[in-house]
Amino acid sequence: MMQKQNMIVVNQKEIAKNIYELVLQGTLVQQMNEPGQFVHIKVAEGIAPLLRRPISICNVDQEKNEFTMLYRAEGQGTKTLATRKQGEMVDVLGPLGHGFPVEEAEAGQTALLVGGGIGVPPLYELSQRLVAKGVRVIHILGFQTKDVVFYEEKFAELGDTYVATVDGTHGTKGFVTDVIDNYGIDFDILYSCGPLAMLRALEGRYKEKKAYISLEERMGCGIGACFACVCHLQEDPSGHSYKKVCSDGPVFPIGEVVL
């Protein structure tokens, strides 16, 4: 159930170039039960920036009432958020959206989790939940260069983990699809989050597979009221049918929406 709460900053640190790990504490964490959901953050106490920032939920610890977000500080809003210090309060709205369907993966099956850039974080909580139910996980994490690689070791603790960098400075040179080809990776179910180009490449390969993708989209309200994040349905070539990424997604079955 969505709530709004002022949450306490437990810790914040830069873990890669311009990539920040922010841990917040509050009872709102008890509502975070679907990996792949996100929160809407008010990054400053004043009027500017006006709009909240959508950030995915990376890790949930309900015993401590803490959750972790990873985000890239690149615009005014996220750069402001990066200045928040331990003990300060952050206005959080969430959890929002529909997450990854963990129930679609069965014990004994192999799940392939593919993340690109800042689309990697929501896959971490998903991976933990899949492992807990007896699913074998394989991770492929794609980044531009070694300076922005993060959480490789954490994913490796859960299952086989491969990294691709576009410039070849770490792991496989190229894209996540190059890793799949190079290692002949097979799987029963696919979960992915990242840039559209990556999602399109995966959709082109795996239309017949059970697969789910999470879209990264700019949002206004985050609750389905402003229609700023709509995407069209593949089944309607007229373009008149659509779904909202914030409330109907951000996770969709592969082949449902136009990428």
UniProtKB/Swiss-Prot annotation:
Residues 2-102 form the FAD-binding FR-type domain. One of its GO terms (molecular function) is flavin adenine dinucleotide binding. [2Fe-2S] cluster binds at C221, C226, C229, C246. Its cofactor is [2Fe-2S] cluster; FAD. Keywords: 2Fe-2S, Electron transport, FAD, Flavoprotein, Iron, Iron-sulfur, Metal-binding, Pyrimidine biosynthesis, Transport. Signal peptide: none annotated. SUPFAM superfamilies: Ferredoxin reductase-like, C-terminal NADP-linked domain (SSF52343), Riboflavin synthase domain-like (SSF63380). Binds 1 [2Fe-2S] cluster per subunit. Binds 1 FAD per subunit. FAD binds at R53, P54, I55, S56, L70, Y71, R72, G77, T78. InterPro entries: Cyt_c3_hydrogenase_gsu, Dihydroorotate_DH_ele_sf, Dihydroorotate_DH_Fe-S-bd, Dihydroorotate_DHASE_ETsu, FAD-bd_FR_type, FNR_nucleotide-bd, OxRdtase_FAD/NAD-bd, PyrK_electron_transfer. One of its GO terms (biological process) is 'de novo' UMP biosynthetic process. Belongs to the PyrK family. Heterotetramer of 2 PyrK and 2 PyrD type B subunits. PANTHER family: DIHYDROOROTATE DEHYDROGENASE B (NAD(+)), ELECTRON TRANSFER SUBUNIT, DIHYDROOROTATE DEHYDROGENASE B (NAD(+)), ELECTRON TRANSFER SUBUNIT-RELATED. This is Dihydroorotate dehydrogenase B (NAD(+)), electron transfer subunit. It comes from Bacillus cereus (strain ATCC 14579 / DSM 31 / CCUG 7414 / JCM 2152 / NBRC 15305 / NCIMB 9373 / NCTC 2599 / NRRL B-3711). The lineage of its organism: Bacteria, Bacillati, Bacillota, Bacilli, Bacillales.
